[in-house]
């Protein structure tokens, strides 16, 4: 085994690889406030149209650098190697926007599909009945849906999305009753959406869907250290007796809220400044979304 690993490191081959983690460029239809142009073609276009935003992302980006998943070479590579897979993870961008995804997973022989697990991370702006029908032949399919709060909070954070569309698509997939589908929520724990966690948890408790927490690391000014102590204490008090479906999620948020209970006002100022800058471009107002008590500076 050691010799095999050394050989793979010095001269890697794909002929025996069974697990693939594919980040499919930056093709995306949303402009999430915590994201960047390398993961969203919409953010890249927005930054190029509004040069004042380029400093937000550390400089300019060229879309041509992220278009490689559209190339014939990569599509042919997928068609050659994915049929041997027992695990494939698709992220983006937004993987369900990639036009050849259905053909790629259909190219896997049926006997191999029965051994293969698929995993998609998606904003669920679009649902392809054709793709979901093909999922039934696989061993298991994980769908992780990115959600930041509810209603206007989600729409502000995942700019370009509609809460009504998300709700409709969640319901549509649930009603398909795909036995091998594991359908869960990903939530980024961060300052701009922190106030909506309680309502979001209640919403997904009712849908019987579990929430997986992702602790935000970048941009650092959206870290929950930017929140007031008062806002975090309110969450802790409100969830002290919570025993619902998403107890593990709530325990995680409680833990990090306690760990970062004190406010870092430098981050608060940077958070407000960044959101204000973005609001000027998008004609939004974060003050309509985030309660003043959450980001006030005494």
Residues of each region from the PLM?
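Extended amphipathic secondary-structure runs
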Residues: 74-103, 284-285, 289, 295-298
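Conserved C-terminal portion of the radical SAM core fold
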Residues: 119, 140-144, 164-297
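Alpha-helical packing segments of well-folded alpha/beta enzyme cores
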Residues: 20, 74-77, 104, 166-169, ...
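N-terminal pre-core extensions flanking Radical SAM catalytic domains
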Residues: 1-65, 81-82, 248-298
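Non-transmembrane alpha-helical segments in soluble domains
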Residues: 32, 79, 102-106, 171-174, ...
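Core AdoMet radical
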Residues: 17-27, 38-69, 83-98, 111-128, ...
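Distinct, well-ordered alpha-helical segments
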Residues: 100-107, 129-136, 196-198
């Amino acid at each position: 085994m050691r010799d095999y690993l050394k050989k793979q490191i010095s001269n890697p081959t794909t002929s025996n690889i069974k697990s693939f983690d594919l980040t499919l460029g930056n093709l995306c239809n949303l402009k999430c406030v915590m994201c960047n142009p390398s993961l969203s073609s919409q953010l890249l276009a927005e930054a190029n149209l509004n040069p004042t935003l380029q400093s937000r992302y550390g400089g300019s980006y060229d879309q041509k650098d992220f278009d490689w998943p559209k190339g014939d070479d990569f599509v042919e590579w997928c068609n050659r190697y994915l049929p041997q897979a027992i695990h494939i993870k698709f992220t983006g961008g937004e993987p369900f926007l990639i036009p050849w995804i259905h053909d790629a997973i259909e190219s896997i022989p049926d006997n191999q599909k029965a051994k293969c697990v698929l995993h998609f991370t998606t904003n669920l702006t679009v649902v392809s009945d054709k793709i979901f029908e093909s999922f039934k032949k696989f061993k298991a399919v994980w769908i992780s849906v990115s959600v930041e709060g509810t209603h206007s909070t989600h729409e502000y954070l995942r700019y370009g999305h509609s809460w009504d569309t998300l709700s409709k698509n969640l319901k549509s997939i649930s009603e398909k009753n795909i036995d091998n589908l594991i359908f869960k929520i990903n939530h980024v724990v961060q300052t701009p959406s922190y106030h909506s966690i309680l309502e979001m948890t209640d919403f997904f408790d009712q849908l019987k869907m579990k929430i997986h927490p992702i602790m935000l690391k970048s941009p650092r000014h959206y870290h929950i250290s930017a929140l007031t102590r008062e806002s975090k204490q309110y969450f802790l008090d409100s969830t002290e007796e919570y025993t619902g479906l998403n107890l593990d999620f709530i325990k995680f948020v409680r833990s990090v809220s306690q760990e970062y209970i004190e406010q870092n006002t430098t981050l608060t100022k940077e958070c407000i400044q960044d959101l204000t800058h973005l609001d000027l471009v998008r004609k939004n107002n974060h003050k309509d979304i985030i309660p003043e008590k959450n980001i006030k500076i005494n």
